[in-house]
């Protein structure tokens, strides 16, 4: 194990034995001396050639650590991060969470919240306006959020949103039917297969 002042170089290949007597070998991808945590990149347990397992090892529970191959050249540079893209993604995630929180605090029913999430998966341009769902600034769905509660200018947008609402509630009903009576469902499947 790494003693005082010792460390594992990124890219080195090491072998160690865990407290469960399992032998692990892999390439060092990270090492934190204060916490004695070692991250190893090992061949994939799924057997896929282009995949790898990353194992985090607490060196307090590892013995017999041996450096098999020390890295001689400098490790490749880290990939650059697109800070603008990351900031945009974080902003969008925050807006979505705030929208969900708004719906809950406004007293929107669970059906309304679920419908909003279903619509939002397909059409990102949807928002809350008090207890109403506004889609693409063209369609307004008011409580109790059924197809007949969809209002807007006749056209493709209204038709599309109505289809999403209709499918959402059909899927919810199908889910309830399956959850209500799984025994009857399995008996029905058995009787039709015989």
UniProtKB/Swiss-Prot annotation:
Segments forming domain AD: 79-173
InterPro entries: AD, Lsm12-like, LSM12_ABD, LSM12_LSM, Sm
Entry keyword annotation includes Cytoplasm: yes
GO cellular component: cytoplasm
Subcellular localization: Cytoplasm
Single GO MF descriptor: RNA binding
Domain of life: Eukaryota
Record domain Sm: where: 1-71
Biased composition, class Polar residues, residue ranges: 176-194
Segments forming a coiled coil: none
Keyword Cytoplasm annotated: yes
Protein task: Nicotinic acid adenine dinucleotide phosphate (NAADP) binding protein.
Protein family per UniProt: Belongs to the LSM12 family.
Official protein name in the record: Protein LSM12
Record lineage: Eukaryota, Metazoa, Chordata, Craniata, Vertebrata
Gene: lsm12
């Amino acid at each position: 194990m790494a003693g005082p002042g010792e460390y594992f170089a990124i890219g080195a290949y090491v072998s160690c034995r865990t407290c469960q007597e399992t032998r692990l070998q892999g390439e060092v991808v990270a090492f934190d001396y204060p916490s004695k945590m070692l991250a190893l990149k090992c061949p994939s347990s799924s057997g896929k050639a282009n995949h790898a397992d990353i194992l985090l090892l607490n060196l307090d529970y590892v013995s017999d650590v041996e450096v098999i191959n020390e890295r001689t050249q400098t490790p490749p540079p880290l990939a650059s991060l697109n800070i603008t893209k990351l900031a945009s993604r974080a902003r969008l995630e925050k807006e979505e969470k705030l929208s969900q929180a708004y719906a809950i605090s406004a007293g929107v029913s669970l059906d309304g919240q679920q419908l909003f999430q279903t619509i939002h998966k397909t059409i990102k341009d949807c928002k809350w306006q008090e207890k109403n769902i506004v889609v693409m600034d063209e369609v307004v769905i008011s409580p109790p959020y059924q197809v007949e509660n969809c209002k807007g200018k006749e056209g493709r947008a209204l038709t599309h949103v109505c289809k999403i609402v209709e499918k959402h509630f059909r899927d919810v009903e199908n889910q309830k039917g399956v959850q209500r009576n799984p025994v009857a469902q399995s008996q029905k499947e058995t009787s039709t297969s015989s």
